[in-house]
């Protein structure tokens, strides 16, 4: 595409170079620069993208986009990219709109569903994708578990990728025949304009509780909530949780039609009281009945435990209903859905059940462990840790929740990011000590050793809940990511004791 076409009506100005040059890609990471691409220098908390302008130009970038100035920037005859100055604070917006235009507005070629909230985004996204697939749609899914569509799976660095990566993925999905995309839209994804230029057909709100508050994230809970609410000014229909107390704030200033789902509050999609937990060899399922819009009743099964899974399923069903999916397809899709690392039961010949879940804060841990209690385990054993370089309140909260709800806690590492484990463990113990007559605790620094120890304790009827990493395939030790997967350790143990 010609640069002049790419720059039309954007908040930026060509300050040096020609506008009639061809560009073929766009990126914001200098390591991804290819000859003929646009490199956008993004301002950041720890570094400034302008520092990498020389490297990008040397690698063949045809255009550099930046805010402010490029200090001490000199070109050689063989390295003289066009320079585009973005208006102050607009570089991210310019990146998003450029990427959307360059890749042919791929979001317009698909039905776009965006899901936001503190908990349940990944589960809701994958349940909805399964339901839409059962209805005959070809569906892509973007979020914490990566970018996935039929025959393709790609890992991502963020729940909501940077806009240049996101638009490239959307183009690949659309070119591969996808007619729907379900994606997780994080608060930072909205704040950093990663979804700029996308109008969602459906926006979904799951729930809200304090999280992602601190340096590099959000300055306050109010700011966190405000950015979540932006989605409902960028979608045609908003599907919201009638039971969540923050829903009115999320809908403040909304411009969409609203559909509500819930368990307790009046809702268009209402789950009736009396969920039935079912425990089988390969699943902890929940049966429930929904009163649909218009008053009809329908029975559903979600292959996951707990009221929170019913709530996530309701969100998916309500969104599917907005899109005209028949009830029979909803039932079949939901029943056969699987979500990696979200209350995932690892198939094993042992007489106890192993559940993997991504829960990494107090609210999520409490939801999971409360749900597992409904299956009346002999003992509920949990293995968990907390990440380094994150809020200490998350650690004390996790410790308190696990001590209150489990019979035995095995505390271990979880992405320490260079912070001493003894400091992390001390914060977890502080939370556990708040609980009178709480669970017994064992500390084992190495996560593999901790898992093997817990598996060795398992008896008939027990449930072993492994929390924190879920789908992840690496662990961060001292700032270095090394291969590690909870499920692989479980499978290794089961092979050994067969």
Model-derived features with residue positions:
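Short secondary-structure boundary segments
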Residues: 66-69, 185, 207, 242, ...
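ATP-dependent carboxylate-amine ligase
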Residues: 1-14, 32-38, 48-51, 255, ...
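N-terminal leader/targeting and accessory segments in enzymes
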Residues: 1-97, 270, 279-281, 297, ...
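Phosphate-binding loop of NTP-binding sites
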Residues: 10, 92-242, 246-257, 314, ...
